[in-house]
């Protein structure tokens, strides 16, 4: 099974991906996580360092695939999860989709692409071109990471459109949304009411999730000496269980941009004014999740 993880830049895709990979490994699966970002830091919390990228390795080998060995590009991370970083083209040049294609090509040459029970693609930021959507060409499922804010859901809607487009060529399905580090889910619920799709899990607003990224450790590793984090790990295990159940998923029908803007902004503003009329808080107390320009 192959799973592609998408979401707005900075939403916590890599942190979430690493913890899901560990959860899948805890369920007895052989897992490979492929980072698809020029920053090549997707697997940092699994390995504890920035591993060499496939593109860097191919350049050193002058693109002679026969000179590349699995140990040159595949690194064993925490919990037995294998890690690969695709890397990317130089800034302002080249195509991210080409890099993903070269990564898959090399893994096939090494007879590694089909050796895993689960391959998880952790993909950079928002989908802005066909190149960044390239991992969807190989995926059975897409998972979108979001929060309870306007911008993340706007990006999720764009990604849903890419899933629908790619589903025309192969049996790709959207497994669902994962809300990351949020204390509420009212906007998420409003969005999925208008654009039906599963919500796999909503992760709590726990500072240790963010801190784990800085420490270069997954929540599972931190929980070994901080048992109070075990309950957070259960959220990721629940996501893993849903993935392993091979859910039916959906082919989403995205909402037109202007309609989505009106839907979420009106809902947000109306709920704000309702709370104000009830004496809950005034304008200065409203926690803004987005800015209208």
Curated annotation (Swiss-Prot):
Single Gene Ontology BP annotation: photosynthesis, dark reaction
Listed cofactors: [4Fe-4S] cluster
Residues the record lists as binding Mg(2+): 14
Cross-referenced InterPro entries: NifH/chlL_CS, NifH/frxC, P-loop_NTPase, Protochlorophyllide_ATP-bd
Domain of life: Eukaryota
PROSITE patterns assigned: NIFH_FRXC_1, NIFH_FRXC_2, NIFH_FRXC_3
Catalytic activity, EC: 1.3.7.7
Binding residues annotated for ATP, in chain numbering: 10-15, 39, 180-181
Catalytic function, reaction form: chlorophyllide a + oxidized 2[4Fe-4S]-[ferredoxin] + 2 ADP + 2 phosphate = protochlorophyllide a + reduced 2[4Fe-4S]-[ferredoxin] + 2 ATP + 2 H2O
Record's keyword terms, sorted: 4Fe-4S, ATP-binding, Chlorophyll biosynthesis, Chloroplast, Iron, Iron-sulfur, Magnesium, Metal-binding, Nucleotide-binding, Oxidoreductase, Photosynthesis, Plastid
GO CC annotation terms, alphabetical: chloroplast
Cofactor note: Binds 1 [4Fe-4S] cluster per dimer.
UniProt main location, coarse: plastid
Metabolic or biological pathway: Porphyrin-containing compound metabolism; chlorophyll biosynthesis (light-independent)
Molecular function terms, GO-annotated: 4 iron, 4 sulfur cluster binding; ATP binding; metal ion binding; oxidoreductase activity, acting on iron-sulfur proteins as donors; oxidoreductase activity, acting on the CH-CH group of donors, iron-sulfur protein as acceptor
Keyword Transmembrane helix in record: no
Binding of [4Fe-4S] cluster, residues: 95, 129
Places the protein is found: Plastid, Chloroplast
Record bears the keyword Iron: yes
Quaternary structure, from the entry: Homodimer. Protochlorophyllide reductase is composed of three subunits; ChlL, ChlN and ChlB.
Protein role: Component of the dark-operative protochlorophyllide reductase (DPOR) that uses Mg-ATP and reduced ferredoxin to reduce ring D of protochlorophyllide (Pchlide) to form chlorophyllide a (Chlide). This reaction is light-independent. The L component serves as a unique electron donor to the NB-component of the complex, and binds Mg-ATP.
NCBIfam families: DPOR_bchL
Record-stated family: Belongs to the NifH/BchL/ChlL family.
Identification of the protein by name: Light-independent protochlorophyllide reductase iron-sulfur ATP-binding protein
Gene name of this polypeptide: chlL
């Amino acid at each position: 099974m192959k799973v592609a993880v998408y979401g707005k830049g900075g939403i916590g895709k890599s942190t979430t991906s690493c913890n899901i990979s560990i959860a899948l490994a805890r369920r007895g699966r052989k897992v490979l996580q492929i980072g698809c970002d020029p920053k090549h830091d997707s697997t940092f919390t699994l390995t504890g360092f920035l591993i060499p990228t496939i593109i860097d390795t191919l350049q050193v080998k002058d693109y002679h695939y026969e000179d590349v060995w699995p140990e040159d590009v595949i690194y064993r991370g925490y919990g037995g999860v294998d890690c690969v970083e695709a890397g990317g083209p130089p800034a302002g040049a080249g195509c991210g989709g080409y890099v993903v294609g070269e990564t898959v090509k090399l893994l096939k040459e090494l007879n590694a692409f089909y050796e895993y029970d689960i391959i998880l693609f952790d993909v950079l930021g928002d989908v802005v071109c066909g190149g960044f959507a390239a991992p969807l060409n190989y995926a059975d499922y897409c998972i979108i990471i979001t929060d309870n804010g306007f911008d993340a859901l706007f990006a999720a809607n764009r990604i849903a459109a890419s899933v629908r487009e790619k589903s025309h060529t192969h049996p790709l399905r959207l497994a669902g949304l994962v809300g990351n580090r949020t204390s509420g889910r009212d906007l998420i619920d409003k969005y999925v009411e208008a654009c039906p799709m599963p919500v796999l899990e909503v992760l709590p607003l726990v500072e240790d999730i963010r801190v784990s990224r800085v420490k270069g450790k997954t929540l599972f590793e931190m929980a070994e000496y901080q048992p109070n984090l075990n309950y957070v790990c259960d959220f990721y295990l629940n996501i893993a269980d849903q993935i392993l159940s091979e859910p039916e998923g959906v082919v989403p029908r995205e909402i037109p941009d202007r309609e989505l803007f009106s839907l979420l902004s009106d809902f947000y503003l109306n709920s704000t004014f309702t709370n104000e009329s009830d004496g809950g808080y005034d304008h200065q107390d409203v926690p803004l999740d987005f800015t209208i320009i």
